[in-house]
C-alpha cells in the first residue's frame, strides 16, 4: 500500500472548509513566505492583505505583488492535531496567481472601514495537489523498542 493517497475533489473541498490557516509563499529577489488566515467561500480561497496604515506599513509582500502575482499557498493539517496521533497528515499545495476582489458582496463579505487598509485577494488556481498519509498510527513518529 502506498504511503500517501491523493485527495478527491470533494475531499479537497471539505479540507478547505475545515481549515483556516495556510502559508503564502512569494518569490522576488529573495523567497518570502508568511503564515496567514484564509476564507473559503463560493469555491474561492480568499486572502486579506494589509496594505498600509494603522495595521502595517507597506512591506515586502505588497512589493512582491507589484513585481509578480504568482504565489504558492500551502495548507497543512499535521498528524499531531489535537491530543493524538490518530489523524492522517494532510497537505494541500496550490500554485497560481492573486487577483484583487472588487466585489466583496459576491462572497458575502461586508465592506470594511476605509481606515483599515486591507485588500481582498482570491487565488486563481493554476495547479493544485492534495494528499494525506495512509500510515495509522504514524510509523515515522513511533519509536519501536
What are these regions (language model features)?
Residues 14-28, 70-75:
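A short, Trp-centered hydrophobic/proline-enriched beta-strand micro-motif
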Residues 20, 34, 43-45, 67-71, ...:
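A generic structural signal for short beta-strands and their flanking turns/coil linkers
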Residues 39-81:
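A short mixed-secondary-structure module that forms the rim of ligand-binding clefts
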Amino acid at each position: 500500500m502506498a504511503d500517501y493517497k491523493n485527495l478527491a475533489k470533494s475531499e479537497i473541498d471539505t479540507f478547505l472548509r475545515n481549515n483556516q490557516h495556510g502559508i503564502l509563499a512569494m518569490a522576488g529577489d529573495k523567497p518570502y513566505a508568511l503564515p496567514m488566515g484564509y476564507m473559503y467561500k463560493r469555491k474561492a480561497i480568499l486572502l486579506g492583505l494589509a496594505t498600509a496604515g494603522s495595521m502595517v506599513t507597506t512591506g515586502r509582500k505588497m512589493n512582491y505583488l507589484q513585481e509578480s502575482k504568482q504565489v504558492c499557498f500551502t495548507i497543512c493539517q499535521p498528524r499531531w492535531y489535537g491530543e493524538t496521533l490518530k489523524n492522517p497528515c494532510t497537505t494541500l499545495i496550490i500554485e497560481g496567481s492573486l487577483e484583487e476582489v472588487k466585489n466583496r458582496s459576491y462572497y458575502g463579505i461586508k465592506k470594511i472601514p476605509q481606515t483599515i487598509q486591507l485588500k481582498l485577494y482570491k487565488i486563481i488556481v493554476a495547479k493544485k495537489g492534495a494528499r494525506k498519509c495512509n500510515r495509522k498510527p504514524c510509523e515515522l513518529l513511533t519509536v519501536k523498542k
